[in-house]
């Protein structure tokens, strides 16, 4: 279901199809979903899945393609191969490409900001306040970019801080996008029915 036929009529499958998908995923900003993003060079699909096959494929972490209303081959799902998250360490957000990208971007941006502070901030109340302020700025920026909802960067009250260390906790909701829209129609035979 991740295979496609290119504009030359050749079937693109296996590593080549995976590489093409990876390129599109990498080029998509973390604030955007890959769902309904066109696959460059794809002309049509070799097969169409039945609904039960589609649902089973998504549950099993298969990145699916479909043809949109304009006849373009597009990503139809934004799931990855993680199908059974570790319940103690992961939630279902890790199963989604967009959300995993936002989370890894958060790690990277906070790590870069914290690296600037290591060895330069005192292990005092004021130093800890500085770390919290700098971490919160990173998270607020990501919220302004539409990637996080109500993020907080706080001192871990269970572990605290000492002369040369500090433990902090990030709480945030990463923004997802609607991947499916369901419409329920309620028609009436007449105005009086």
Question: Which role does the model predict for each range below?
Answer:
Residues 105-156:
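Extended, compositionally biased non-globular segments
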Residues 68, 146-148, 163:
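A generic structural signal for short, non-catalytic loop/turn and secondary-structure boundary residues
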Residues 152-193:
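Compositionally biased, low-complexity/repeat regions
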Residues 1-116, 131, 155:
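A glycine- and small-residue-enriched flexible loop/hinge signal that marks low-structured segments
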Residues 1, 97, 104, 108, ...:
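Residue-level signal for functionally critical sites in structured catalytic/ligand-binding pockets
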């Amino acid at each position: 279901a991740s295979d496609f036929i290119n504009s030359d009529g050749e079937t693109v499958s296996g590593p080549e199809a995976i590489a093409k998908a990876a390129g599109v995923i990498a080029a998509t900003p973390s604030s955007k979903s890959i769902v309904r993003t066109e696959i460059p060079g794809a002309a049509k699909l070799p097969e169409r899945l039945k609904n039960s096959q589609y649902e089973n494929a998504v549950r099993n972490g298969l990145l699916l393609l479909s043809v949109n209303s304009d006849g373009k081959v597009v990503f139809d799902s934004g799931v990855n191969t993680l199908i059974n998250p570790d319940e103690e360490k992961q939630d279902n957000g890790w199963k989604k490409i967009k959300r995993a990208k936002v989370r890894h971007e958060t790690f990277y941006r906070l790590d870069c900001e914290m690296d600037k502070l290591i060895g330069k901030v005192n292990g005092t109340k004021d130093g800890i306040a500085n770390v919290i302020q700098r971490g919160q700025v990173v998270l607020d920026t990501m919220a302004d970019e539409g990637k996080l909802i109500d993020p907080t960067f706080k001192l871990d009250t269970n572990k605290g801080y000492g002369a040369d260390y500090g433990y902090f906790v990030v709480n945030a909701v990463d923004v997802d996008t609607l991947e499916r829209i369901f419409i329920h129609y309620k028609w009436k035979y007449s105005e009086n029915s």
